[in-house]
């Protein structure tokens, strides 16, 4: 059930991004850019990066991308908290879900049995306060931001032509150092996140993703603008820190509830 929810939402989100970005063009981005995608998605990201860069010492666009990423991720903390709490509830419900699964066995060949199983599972999740969509929102929100950032970097000359450390933000890292760091931080971030996942099938699925996602990031990072790879790295480090902090807070809350 969770997989179907996520698959539908992710597919719709990707379709939304592709449709809007398809209406985009290669013209430079500024306040007069037209079209929903350019005016309401790409330009605000471009403006934010330029505004921050012009108000910090050295006018570093690399630092501006890092700050912008931290601001966006900080604004998404309430969604991350909701996601974490949802996972904690799912863990608590796991024994009951396993009993339900054992009770009905293989329901793939019996439509009536399958309907009854899904009905009882939905009731159990509802009574446990688990929201199957809670874990999807951070991903769905990041998709248009990620795509808009790519266009903001590639179509804003001031950002595209600026340098940060050894790279040009509008070009791929010639030494492939940033893509390797992005792939490593993606792997570590997923490893840290794994401890919050319910044991069983989801863990096996995550183990596959732990190999596929870093490999995909590495492959894409070889050709992606360095500014975009910098966004990945900053986001990964923020998510790792956030997961560790939230885990400690939730564990403390759980301990206090047990003592009460």
Curated annotation (Swiss-Prot):
A lipid is attached at residue 23 (N-palmitoyl cysteine). Keywords: Cell membrane, Chaperone, Lipoprotein, Membrane, Palmitate, Protein transport, Signal, Transmembrane, Transmembrane helix, Transport. The keyword Protein biosynthesis does not apply. GO terms for biological process: protein insertion into membrane; protein transport. A lipid is attached at residue 23 (S-diacylglycerol cysteine). It comes from the Bacteria. It is a multi-pass membrane protein. Its main location: membrane. Required for the insertion and/or proper folding and/or complex formation of integral membrane proteins into the membrane. Involved in integration of membrane proteins that insert both dependently and independently of the Sec translocase complex, as well as at least some lipoproteins. This is Membrane protein insertase YidC 1. The lineage of its organism: Bacteria, Bacillati, Bacillota, Bacilli, Bacillales.
